[in-house]
């Protein structure tokens, strides 16, 4: 069985922190986002920094959790700061810490290509697949089934929608607000991953 982890000190620390602060539904989403992105990279022959991508994926939504939810910053920026602090504690150099932050901030944009920023693109692909089912049909059914068995959804669609709708109300100029206004509820509700 595939584990979809990055077995480095930084990878283990990111998983530990994510498990401590995210509920099981959000934690599983983070792992699935990494897995979808890594699988996409393998299918498209994309080279990327596995540890950077994994750590960023595991903590990318911690800005949605109560301890890290900023009253002024969009959740992806708050999550980027969490990544920067976490990776500083792990001894990452300043430029790599900044990359972790950037990967998380840019994952909310769908216009970042793999050529521009491969890790940000992979996180965007992975999160879009998991949140709204975008590109899910491109993944092998056996891969998706194994992933969902190992990291079940646990009502993720409804809980995530509630989190981003809350962000949209409190921070009307953030990317989450634009996402909600653009039909997030319909896209999340139609996710084929929840129709299984």
Where are these regions (language model features)?
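His-Asp-centered metal-binding catalytic motifs of divalent-metal-dependent phosphohydrolases/nucleases
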Residues: 51-69, 79, 101-110
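An active-site-proximal "capping" alpha-helix that borders the catalytic cofactor pocket
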Residues: 33-35, 74-90
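Active-site flanking loop/helix segments enriched in acidic
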Residues: 11-29, 62-65
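Short alpha-helical hairpin
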Residues: 1-15
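Alpha-helix N-cap and coil->helix boundary residues
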Residues: 28, 48-54, 74, 95-99, ...
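A generic, well-ordered mixed alpha/beta core segment in the N-terminal half of proteins
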Residues: 86-104
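Divalent metal-dependent phosphate-bond-processing catalytic cores, especially two-metal-ion Mg2+/Mn2+ enzymes
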Residues: 1, 21-46, 92, 109-196
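Short coil/turn segments at secondary-structure boundaries
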Residues: 66-74, 91-92
